[in-house]
Structures are given as structure tokens and as C-alpha cells.
Curated annotation (Swiss-Prot):
Described purpose of this protein according to its UniProt entry: NmrA-like family domain-containing oxidoreductase; part of the gene cluster that mediates the biosynthesis of notoamide, a fungal indole alkaloid that belongs to a family of natural products containing a characteristic bicyclo[2.2.2]diazaoctane core. The first step of notoamide biosynthesis involves coupling of L-proline and L-tryptophan by the bimodular NRPS notE', to produce cyclo-L-tryptophan-L-proline called brevianamide F.
Keyword set, alphabetical order: Alkaloid metabolism, NADP, Oxidoreductase
Keyword check for Nucleotide-binding: no
Gene symbol of the encoding locus: notA'
Record field: transmembrane: none
Protein name per the record: NmrA-like family domain-containing oxidoreductase notA'
Organism from which the protein derives: Aspergillus versicolor
Length: 357
């Protein structure tokens, strides 16, 4: 396909945890030109995307005129607003919806974007009749509805994110989890300490690998955006309860045996072979504390308890849509059929955590 026929997809939040994988996946498809919006074009993350072939554009989401310029000439857009931005912690500061509205208004004024994929979430206030509210989720849902009701776009596709597998890559975060997956406790276990997900028993959670699958899932939507207009796409790589996730981490052969086998044969052990356990937390308030992130986490688990683990609300927890989209994107990238499947938690731990243990 010639450069004049390539369609431009612009990514807002391009150096973030979601936007980065989207840019990297789309760049592997010659049918698309990829424009990456960032507040800091001089950052190492932005330079890395430029080295891969992305067009880097400076843009501040709070400045509408910059959004108009950044999205001008684009055929489609992926947008994720950062709910963890400390500016939203100030009750006197504009909200995440205010930011999202400026971005959407800028896209509309740019005049060329036909297809929008927005990283949204469940309207928890409506779903629970105000009984278990996650403020960040409601802000995202409100932005989604604003975009859809504008009447400007040919298609608007809302994404619901699974729980990030990627949080287990950071050793600094492990201490907040009880040590899992990097640090042993006094009993020589790598212990995960979190509240139970669900009302009375451990309910399954949808897990997503941002680096391995998320970008390809979004890529797949842009191949046939009309198929996903107004349709929630849950991004899910694997589905497991916390105890099942611990099993995935532990699976494999003991470390010494794994070391010898991998060097003497072509067999590779899966995951880590390390001892781990899950201990449900009962005193939620004491566990999470009164920090902003602690209160946000508490709200999420209260939602899980109230809904008996309905993480996506009325949307089913399934890998079906994600698997279809991943396969389509991989085919468009020219990947081998064996490299078109979603990653499992076992495979993810083996790939991303085992080398660090």
C-alpha cells in the first residue's frame, strides 16, 4: 500500500501503559500510519516510538487547540485518559470527564476522525444503584457516552480492561501485595495478600497482558471498526481466580531441575516452580489505608463484593472477542499462525517474571 493510501490512526496517551502497546502493534501493519500524542516528545518513551516509525506530536489534552492540530487528518483514534493523574485527586481541580470532553471536542473539531476506540469502563453508579461506586470508572463511562452521543463518529467502540498482568512486573509493587511474586515471607512463600474477589467465594477475574495482547486487540478493532460500533470489547488474555493465578505462577518444575533440563534438552518448564500462596485479607480498610490509591482499591473490591465478582458489569467475562481480534491483527502483521494466540498467565509468568527470580 502506498503512503498516500495509508490511513492515519492517532493515539492519545501514546507513551502510557495502554497507548504504547497500541502504537507498537499498529506500526507492524503497513496499512496504517501511526501518530503518537505525548506531552513530552523529548522523553525516552517517545523517542523509542519514533525509532519504530511513529510520528510524534506534542499535545496537552487540556488544550483544545492542540488536540485539534494533533488529530487533524486522522482517520481513527485511540484515547485513554489517565485516571491515576494526581491532578484528579484535588476536589477543586477539573475532573477526568472534563479532560475527556476537551479531547473529544478537539477530535470533533479536527473534522476527519471517523472511528474512535475509547478506554472506558462500567458505569458503576448505575450498575449498583449507587451502592458500590468506583469514581474513575464512572468518569470514563461518562466520557464514552459523551463521545457516542455527539453524533460525529461513524463508530465508537468502548474497551473494558481486565486486571493488568503487567503489575506483577514491578518489584516495588510487590510489597503492597504481600511480597508476591518476588519476595518470600517468613514461611518461605511468595504470598499474595488481597481481599477476596466476590461475595463469599473466589470468583474468576479477567486478566490482560498489555504488552503481549492489548495492542493487538485494539489493532484488530481498527481492521473492521464497523463490527464493533457501540459494542463493548472486554480485553482479556486469561481468566482465573486468585488461587488459580497462584497455581499458574507455581506451575513448572523445581528450579534446579528446570535449570538442568533446559540446558540438556529442548524442553522448557512453564512458569516459575516457586512456592506461593494466596491469603485473603479480611480487614480491608487497614490493608489499603487512607491514601488515594488505597481508597480507590478499596472501592474496586467493594464493587466486586457487591456484584459477586461481575468485573465487567453485565458484560460476560470471556476471551472470545479478544482472541478473535488478536488473531486478525496478527494475520494483518504477517505473523505465523502459531503466534496468533492470547498469552496465558502460565506463559506470562514464565516470560516476564521467571527470568527475574
Amino acid at each position: 500500500m502506498t503512503n498516500t493510501n495509508r490511513r492515519t490512526i492517532t493515539v492519545y496517551g501514546a507513551t502510557g501503559a495502554q497507548g504504547g502497546p497500541v502504537v507498537r502493534s499498529l506500526l507492524k501493519n503497513n496499512a496504517f500510519k501511526v501518530r503518537a500524542i505525548t506531552r513530552k516528545p523529548e522523553s525516552e518513551a517517545a523517542k523509542a516510538l519514533a525509532d519504530l516509525g511513529a510520528e510524534i506530536v506534542q499535545g496537552d489534552g487540556w488544550k483544545k487547540e492542540q488536540m485539534v492540530a494533533a488529530f487533524s487528518g486522522s482517520w481513527a483514534a485511540f484515547v485513554n485518559t489517565n485516571s491515576d493523574d494526581p491532578c484528579f485527586w484535588d476536589a477543586n481541580h477539573p475532573t477526568e470527564f472534563d479532560l475527556g470532553k476537551i479531547i473529544i471536542d478537539g477530535i470533533i473539531q479536527a473534522g476527519t476522525v471517523k472511528h474512535l476506540v475509547y478506554s472506558s469502563f462500567v458505569d458503576t453508579s448505575s450498575f449498583t444503584n449507587g451502592q458500590a461506586i468506583i469514581e474513575a470508572a464512572d468518569e470514563k463511562s461518562k466520557i464514552e457516552r459523551y463521545a457516542a452521543s455527539s453524533g460525529h463518529f461513524d463508530t465508537v467502540c468502548p474497551l473494558y480492561q481486565g486486571w493488568y498482568m503487567d503489575v506483577f512486573r514491578g518489584q516495588e509493587y510487590a510489597h503492597a501485595l504481600g511480597g508476591f511474586p518476588y519476595f518470600e515471607d517468613e514461611d518461605k512463600f511468595r504470598t499474595l495478600r488481597l481481599p477476596r474477589w466476590g461475595t463469599h467465594t473466589d470468583m474468576p477475574l479477567p486478566w490482560i497482558s498489555l504488552e503481549d495482547d492489548f495492542g493487538d486487540i485494539v489493532h484488530g478493532i481498527f481492521l473492521t471498526p464497523e463490527d464493533y460500533n457501540g459494542r463493548v470489547v472486554p480485553t482479556v488474555s486469561d481468566i482465573r481466580t486468585y488461587p488459580e493465578m497462584i497455581d499458574a505462577f507455581q506451575s513448572g518444575m523445581p528450579s534446579l531441575f528446570w535449570f538442568l533440563v533446559c540446558r540438556l534438552t529442548s524442553v522448557h518448564a512453564l512458569a516459575t516452580g516457586q512456592k506461593a500462596r494466596y491469603i485473603p485479607v479480611t480487614d480491608w480498610e487497614a490493608h489499603f489505608g487512607d491514601s488515594h490509591h488505597g481508597k480507590e482499591s478499596l472501592a474496586i473490591f467493594k464493587f466486586g463484593k457487591f456484584t459477586n465478582g461481575k468485573y465487567f458489569g453485565d458484560e460476560p467475562i470471556s476471551t472470545d472477542i479478544s482472541a478473535t481480534l488478536k488473531a486478525k491483527a496478527a494475520e494483518a502483521q504477517g505473523k505465523d499462525p502459531s503466534d496468533r494466540k492470547l498469552i496465558t498467565l502460565v506463559e506470562w509468568f514464565e516470560k516476564h517474571v521467571a527470568p527475574l527470580l
